[in-house]
């Protein structure tokens, strides 16, 4: 069981079962199957769904702020600021999606069309930290979905209910269930998922030691990883 102890009073705040092998397999399989349909969904439709996702998330702000305070020990008066940051970041990425995802013309000549095309990778595995659990995760989730990728989110064991709130908003918004999913995982299962051929990219925010483990897990595979590591960006 994944047990979260509140720093406020050292009480047991939440207790959630870790994902079983069958749940992990079903999640990977459904995400792998969904990636083609989501990739072929036009950008305007993806944007509409993600706008709804953000609105649905913010509509539950009072509950989210209370949970956030109890999970990580931040004064509740300061929790609203993170939700404002979530909204600002998400809206910026939504509003700039066409420009960011448009192909880049590198050179024109009479014989060839030279350009860089920005295509979806497939399934993105996002590993998010506890310290800014929404502001860090939105930086990975929203651009991944906008670009036509499916997302599987694994949140910190200190803030697992943040993943639950994001999933609740995604379901309410109409984003297909297999396009955005969450898993509660231990370290062993996390490494196995990273090594699975159905994961096409990893986005991790956390410690330097955690980043090293990510690199080890993808060491035998030809996939990329975005690592934001305690003031170090790779």
Which role does the model predict for each range below?
Residues 1-113:
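N-terminal Rossmann-like NAD(P)+-binding subdomain of aldehyde/semialdehyde dehydrogenases
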Residues 22, 59, 63, 74, ...:
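Short alpha-helical
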Residues 45, 49, 147-158, 162, ...:
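Short loop-to-beta-strand entry elements in the cores of soluble alpha/beta enzymes
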Residues 123, 174-232:
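Conserved NAD(P)+-binding/catalytic subdomain of aldehyde/semialdehyde dehydrogenases
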Residues 90, 163-166, 193, 214:
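Hydrophobic packing residues within well-ordered alpha-helices of enzyme cores
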């Amino acid at each position: 069981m994944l047990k979260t102890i509140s720093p406020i009073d050292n009480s047991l705040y939440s207790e959630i079962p870790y994902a079983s092998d069958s749940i992990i397999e079903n999640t990977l399989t459904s995400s792998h199957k969904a990636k083609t349909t989501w990739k072929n969904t036009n950008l305007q439709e993806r944007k509409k769904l993600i706008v709804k996702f953000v609105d649905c998330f913010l509509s539950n702000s009072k509950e989210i702020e209370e949970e956030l305070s109890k999970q990580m020990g931040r004064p509740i008066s300061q929790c609203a600021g993170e939700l404002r940051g979530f909204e600002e970041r998400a809206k910026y990425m939504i509003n700039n999606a066409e420009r960011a995802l448009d192909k880049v013309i590198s050179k024109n000549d009479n014989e060839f069309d030279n350009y860089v095309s920005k295509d979806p990778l497939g399934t993105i595995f996002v590993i998010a930290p506890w310290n800014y659990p929404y502001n860090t995760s939105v930086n990975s989730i929203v651009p991944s979905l906008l670009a036509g990728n499916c997302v599987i989110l694994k949140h910190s064991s200190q803030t697992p209910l943040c993943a639950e709130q994001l999933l609740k908003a995604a379901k309410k918004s109409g984003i297909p269930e297999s396009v955005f999913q969450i898993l509660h995982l231990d370290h062993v299962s996390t490494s196995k998922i990273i090594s699975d051929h159905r994961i096409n990219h990893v986005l991790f925010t956390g410690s330097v030691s955690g980043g090293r483990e990510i690199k080890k897990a993808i060491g035998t595979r030809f996939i990329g990883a975005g690592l934001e590591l305690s003031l170090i960006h790779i």
